[in-house]
């Protein structure tokens, strides 16, 4: 039985290192771009609500899939998140597009949390060893 704790620890670390910065500075960043404070609050709340509603849907899709789609779902959400935050570097984007892209980036980042947890369970179920507590502690 192969121990994947180190690999899973790196996955947790990179996820939390990337997503924590986006969440921690969301208000400051969007206000500096000229997004009104009420709109910032609304967008971040919508990202959280969308995450709450879509997480069970994605979990259901992953559970019902005939083949292992969890990694593909994580990859898709990661790419979407990267694209949304990378587009923030483009000068001259309309203000609302900037705000919505940031919201979608935060949403796609938030929705990955249960998928990362499910990845540990799936690997353990497939016969691999992962010390979730140690890996999550590193991440």
Go through the PLM ranges and name each one.
Residues 19, 48-55, 109:
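Residue-level signal for conserved functional micro-sites within the alpha-helical transmembrane segments
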Residues 50-52, 130-139:
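Glycine-rich segments within core transmembrane alpha-helices of 12-TM secondary carriers
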């Amino acid at each position: 039985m192969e121990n994947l704790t180190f690999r899973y620890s790196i996955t947790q670390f990179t996820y939390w290192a990337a997503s924590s910065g986006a969440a921690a500075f969301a208000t400051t960043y969007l206000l500096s771009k000229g997004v009104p404070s009420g709109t910032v609050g609304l967008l971040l709340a919508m990202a959280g609500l969308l995450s709450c509603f879509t997480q069970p849907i994605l979990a259901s899709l992953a559970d019902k899939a005939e083949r292992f789609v969890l990694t593909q779902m994580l990859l898709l959400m990661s790419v979407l998140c990267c694209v949304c935050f990378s587009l923030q570097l483009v000068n001259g984007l309309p203000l609302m597009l900037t705000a919505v892209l940031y919201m979608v980036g935060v949403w796609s980042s938030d929705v990955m949390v249960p998928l990362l947890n499910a990845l540990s369970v799936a690997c353990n179920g497939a016969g691999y060893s992962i010390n979730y507590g140690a890996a999550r502690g590193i991440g």
